[in-house]
Amino acid sequence: MTAGKKLDARALRADFPIFEQEINGKPLAYLDSANTSQKPRQVLDGMTQFYETSYSNVHRAVHTLAERATSGLEGAREKVRAFLNAPDVREVIFVRNATEALNLVAYAWGGNNLGPGDAVVVTELEHHSNFVPWQYIAQRQGAEFLMLEIDENGDPNLSQLDEIARDHTVKVVATNLVSNSLGTIHDLTPLVTWAHEQGAVFVCDAAQAAPHMKLDVQALGADFVAISGHKMCGPSGIGVLWGRGDLLQAMEPFLLGGHMINSVRVDKTTWGELPHKFEAGTSPIAEAFGLGLAIDYLEDIGLDAIEAHEHELAAYALGLLADVPGIKLYGPGAERRAGVVSFNLEGIHPHDVAQILDLSGVAIRAGHHCCQPLMQKLGVAATNRASFYLYTIPEEIDQLVDGLYAVRKVFA
């Protein structure tokens, strides 16, 4: 797709075999892409070919298949580096998912740099993957775990920062770029600047950002960034931690075993160089290759086109949903929202809503979305969440809205 060309979601749907089926006799309206994305043939077929022609273990042998597999893995690493605009490919660490990436930072950096008198700052909006590891490691290390409150749009209360800086030694600030629950797109510049003024590291959960918009880690200014392949048309089982090279060099390993060593003796083991120090055991080889294919696919379409398409869908959805009787919408307006819309129907449990929608072929998520502190803030146990991606078409949103009117009739 050429630069500036509008995304054609109808044409792109032909790349996704899953849309060839019906669910309960209805066209599949897959509105759960914030949970996980569907996979195009370019990724599925490419991974199959890799398994059939090039699969072997990597960095461990000199035979032809090993060389092919290693080339595939390291080629994918370079694609990730370019995708993130990271300065050095050695800063790209392959992990299972964003959750593991964030745990790696919490344990390997936090476990060696946090102590009594220090503080970790997060927000009420965080996915548990960027909340629970910091909560745990702070408690284990005797550090304080502090939380910025958010407003109804999901924006953190920056007026708390002066008091926090006055009363605490902040070592970590951790938050998301895009909320997985409200869809809020954040301007992180004030928080990044403040964190660095405190001498703290800034950890960014970009799992919901990387699939939907251009992500430049150097412009972002974060010290660590986590993404997940399965949310961006890639396979499950592959994620990425990007970190500043000087910080990664100074950190101890997270997992120990094969591949991550330099030498092993009875009295001492030394670690390998970056990125291998953090990639113990057999790598997710085909999964990394698949992530590289997914990046090719997204960049061919254009991240700007994907972002614009999702803004249009969000505006369309918010306009229709606002007219549904008894609905409560959460989060900001369409201009500051990624392709995520969370809502509740008055008097109807979200799980009941989701089950009835499934009868109409509509797939959404119902639950706390791994954001229980946010649910507590909103005063609810759960919400419904519809989420969009590059293959979403307006008719699927129509199908959702029609389904919600049907839900209202069932519970009338």
Sequence positions of predicted segments:
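Pyridoxal 5′-phosphate
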Residues: 1-412
